[in-house]
């Protein structure tokens, strides 16, 4: 049962808010979501969900937007990152986690280490596709907002689900991510940026990723301002663009050293 219960004429389309799931019928999305207030750009055509799987085409850098909002400030940071990658001729793929179905980790490891297998036992959602992307990409750049001095729950679910990749050495299998490069971008209204970045990095560190030199970029606005002004601040602040360009450049330079190949088979995995 949808919340917009009027009959849908043939000329109208169903739209779903990617943030809260509100369903709307009309020729175009509403200007803002009646339930969560998100702008109309957050709406996607409604329809049956197709399980996401990696198509196997090679690429270099994986861009992950961990925010609930596809087109908010975190999305803007990835816009800037994508712009720099394009300028450098580096292939990449970009994903907004809010568009995908990623369930909570089942915590099989807590029952017995060997029960946490790869591929993941939960193959019914979209995460197996992301596991394959992580195994393929030479580098990852994660962009995150700040929620209560930490990453949002959506991103944490995504990172929790990488446990099966970190756990490969318990199964006497070779790692798939050791020596890859990671960069982290964080934005928020107030404080908690560096803590958020380090919390994110901890997951990647345990998978064998190497943080690019100067690989963390962050910016906050300020508690004295209304959060409605954050968008204009980030988009008009030259420092934001320069820092993102720097992080992306550092990730690419480090990635192109091909340290992953140099370290292959030489690292000793250590559990957290």
Each language-model region and where it sits:
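N-terminal beta1-alpha1-beta2 submodule of the flavodoxin-like/Rossmannoid cofactor-binding fold
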Residues: 2-3, 21-22, 35-37, 45-172, ...
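Short, glycine-/small-residue-rich phosphate/pyrophosphate-handling segment
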Residues: 171-217
């Amino acid at each position: 049962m949808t919340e917009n219960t009027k009959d849908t004429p043939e000329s109208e389309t169903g739209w779903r808010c990617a943030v809260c799931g509100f369903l709307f019928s009309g020729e175009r999305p509403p200007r803002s979501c009646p339930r969560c207030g998100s702008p109309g750009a957050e709406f996607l055509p409604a329809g049956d969900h197709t399980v996401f799987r990696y198509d196997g085409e090679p690429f270099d850098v994986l861009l992950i937007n961990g925010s609930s909002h596809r087109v908010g400030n975190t999305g803007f940071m990835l816009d800037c990152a994508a712009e720099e990658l394009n300028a450098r001729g580096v292939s990449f793929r970009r994903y907004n986690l809010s568009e995908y179905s990623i369930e909570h980790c089942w915590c099989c490891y807590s029952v017995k280490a060997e029960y946490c297998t790869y591929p993941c036992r939960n193959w019914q959602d979209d995460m197996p596709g992301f596991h394959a992307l992580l195994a393929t990409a030479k580098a990852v750049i994660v962009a995150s907002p700040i929620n209560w001095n930490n990453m949002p729950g959506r991103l944490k679910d995504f990172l929790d689900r990488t446990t099966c990749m970190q756990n490969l050495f318990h199964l006497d299998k070779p790692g798939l991510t050791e020596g890859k490069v990671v960069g982290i971008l964080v934005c928020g209204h107030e404080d908690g940026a560096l803590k958020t970045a380090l919390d994110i990095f901890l997951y990647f560190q345990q998978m064998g990723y190497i943080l690019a030199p100067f690989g963390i970029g962050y910016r906050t606005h300020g508690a004295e301002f209304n959060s409605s002004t954050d968008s204009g601040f980030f988009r008009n602040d030259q420092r934001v663009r320069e820092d993102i360009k720097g992080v992306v450049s550092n990730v690419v330079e480090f990635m192109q050293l091909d340290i992953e190949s140099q370290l292959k088979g030489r690292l000793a995995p250590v559990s957290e």
